[in-house]
């Protein structure tokens, strides 16, 4: 049983998956840093320093000054938090779009530089075509 587990755990696909998860986690941290440390301050400057995360509608109880106090007092609709998450999502999607676009461009460039190799099927079909052309 241990031998089977060892074979499973050390297969190339499992190791590739583990590496992908680790790199994905690191990439997620990098993208979050780009959003929170670069783009959100710029958006804050453009919007005049509006803090969307503290915008809410209080459904019950007395009117409160902060979201945390309003949540403690009763039901709230935290639409500002939703706006903040929506902005974060759009920025992350935008950054990832350009990253993937650049990666695809590099891939196409690399594929274009490789010599155009014909497959064995194509070679066989070419030979058959040539033989048929000679018989005519």
Curated annotation (Swiss-Prot):
InterPro entries: Mechanosensitive_channel_CS, MS_channel, MSC/AndL, MscL_channel
Superkingdom of this protein's organism: Bacteria
Pfam families: MscL (PF01741)
UniProt keyword annotation of Glycosyltransferase present: no
Membrane topology: Multi-pass membrane protein
Any one of the GO CC terms: plasma membrane
PROSITE patterns listed in its UniProt record: MSCL
Subcellular location: Cell inner membrane
Record keywords: Cell inner membrane, Cell membrane, Ion channel, Ion transport, Membrane, Transmembrane, Transmembrane helix, Transport
Keyword Nucleotide-binding found: no
TM spans (from-to): 15-35, 38-58, 80-100
GO function term, MF aspect, one: mechanosensitive monoatomic ion channel activity
Subunit structure: Homopentamer.
Family named by the database record: Belongs to the MscL family.
Known function: Channel that opens in response to stretch forces in the membrane lipid bilayer. May participate in the regulation of osmotic pressure changes within the cell.
Protein name according to UniProt: Large-conductance mechanosensitive channel
Organism: Bartonella tribocorum (strain CIP 105476 / IBS 506)
Lineage of the species this protein comes from: Bacteria, Pseudomonadati, Pseudomonadota, Alphaproteobacteria, Hyphomicrobiales
